[in-house]
């Protein structure tokens, strides 16, 4: 079929139907959203939960939500800017931080639902494939599906690091190893050691070592915060191991006290008096004037 030019005449505009607002803004993939939100018709009042992973320049957001007609409802959320209280001060947007954020949201939602003792997940991180097995005499594992939005699903992407953290945290998420670091599309094989190295930030440590040897100025510029905190390449694995254990020990969200907004405002004019204050002021003026007259007459 040859090229057909679209004639934008009256009939074209009369039949034209605009796309959804969030599709016009390039924010939502409705083809994927439909399949992530529609539940089987024989499952009544059972929402389909989604593990939502969103990446920004300075933060990683991981949420567990389900869809309702009035809008999505978030069951639980975790952010990479919470990681400093678990000992991770820098590198809050790399693969290792994404894994920790996924682990945090998994332990947090299971703690909220009272399933954290039944489903501990993978306590020893090896980088290998892990799937949660439901217990025989108890509730099933919490099942959800990965929602990456408009992010590119390339092999080794950070969204899959967050998913791996959630799976190791005890959530039941359908997945394969084909998108984890260490998978080779040519040989169709998966190297778990490469994946484990990414989970513990060893790819960052290797880059730190090579950059320090090749260009010390670039090393000081790119890793200035690491240098300021005294973090070396050999320290990263221990930092992430301690963070994983700290997350498992206490995944709950701590509500920070809001700063008091009691600000003393400057006033450039006189404050308006109430009726009682005005009467008191006039009475004081009268008493002072009478006292002044009496002192003059006595003199």
From Swiss-Prot:
InterPro entries: Rbsml_uL18_euk, Ribosomal_uL18_C_euk
GO-annotated molecular function: 5S rRNA binding; RNA binding; structural constituent of ribosome
A biological-process GO annotation: cytoplasmic translation
GO CC entries: cytosolic large ribosomal subunit; cytosolic ribosome; nucleus
Protein location: Cytoplasm; Nucleus
Keywords, ordered alphabetically: Cytoplasm, Nucleus, Ribonucleoprotein, Ribosomal protein, RNA-binding, rRNA-binding
Coiled coil spans: none
Known function: Component of the ribosome, a large ribonucleoprotein complex responsible for the synthesis of proteins in the cell. The small ribosomal subunit (SSU) binds messenger RNAs (mRNAs) and translates the encoded message by selecting cognate aminoacyl-transfer RNA (tRNA) molecules. The large subunit (LSU) contains the ribosomal catalytic site termed the peptidyl transferase center (PTC), which catalyzes the formation of peptide bonds, thereby polymerizing the amino acids delivered by tRNAs into a polypeptide chain.
Subunit (UniProt): Component of the large ribosomal subunit (LSU). Interacts with Fmr1 to form the RNA-induced silencing complex (RISC), a ribonucleoprotein (RNP) complex involved in translation regulation, other components of the complex are Rm62, RpL11, AGO2 and Dcr-1.
Record-linked HAMAP family: Ribosomal_uL18_A
Family: Belongs to the universal ribosomal protein uL18 family.
Protein name in UniProt: Large ribosomal subunit protein uL18
Species whose genome carries this gene: Drosophila melanogaster
């Amino acid at each position: 079929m040859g090229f057909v030019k679209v004639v934008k005449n009256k009939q074209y505009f009369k039949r034209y139907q605009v796309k959804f607002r969030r599709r016009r803004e390039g924010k939502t993939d409705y083809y994927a959203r439909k399949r992530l939100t529609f539940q089987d018709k024989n499952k009544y009042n059972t929402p389909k939960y989604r593990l939502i992973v969103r990446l920004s320049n300075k933060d990683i957001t991981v949420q567990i939500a389900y869809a309702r007609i009035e809008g999505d409802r978030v069951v639980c959320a975790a952010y990479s800017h919470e990681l400093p209280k678990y000992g991770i001060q820098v590198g809050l947007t790399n693969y290792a931080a994404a894994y920790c954020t996924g682990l945090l949201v998994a332990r947090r939602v299971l703690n909220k639902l009272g399933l954290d003792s039944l489903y501990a997940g993978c306590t020893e991180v090896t980088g290998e494939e892990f799937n949660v097995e439901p217990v025989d005499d108890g509730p099933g594992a919490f099942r959800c599906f990965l929602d990456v939005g408009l992010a590119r699903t390339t092999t080794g992407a950070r969204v899959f690091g967050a998913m791996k953290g959630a799976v190791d945290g005890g959530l039941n998420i359908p997945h394969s190893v084909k998108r984890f670091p260490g998978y080779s599309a040519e040989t169709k094989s998966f190297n778990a050691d490469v994946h484990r190295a990414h989970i513990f930030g060893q790819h960052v440590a290797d880059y730190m070592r090579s950059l320090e040897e090749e260009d010390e100025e670039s090393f000081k510029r790119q890793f200035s915060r690491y240098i300021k905190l005294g973090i070396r390449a050999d320290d990263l694995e221990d930092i992430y191991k301690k963070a994983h254990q700290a997350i498992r020990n206490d995944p709950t969200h701590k509500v920070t006290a809001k700063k008091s907004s009691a600000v003393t405002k400057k006033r450039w004019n006189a404050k308006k008096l109430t009726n009682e204050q005005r009467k008191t002021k006039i009475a004081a003026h009268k008493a002072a004037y009478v006292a002044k007259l009496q002192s003059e007459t006595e003199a």
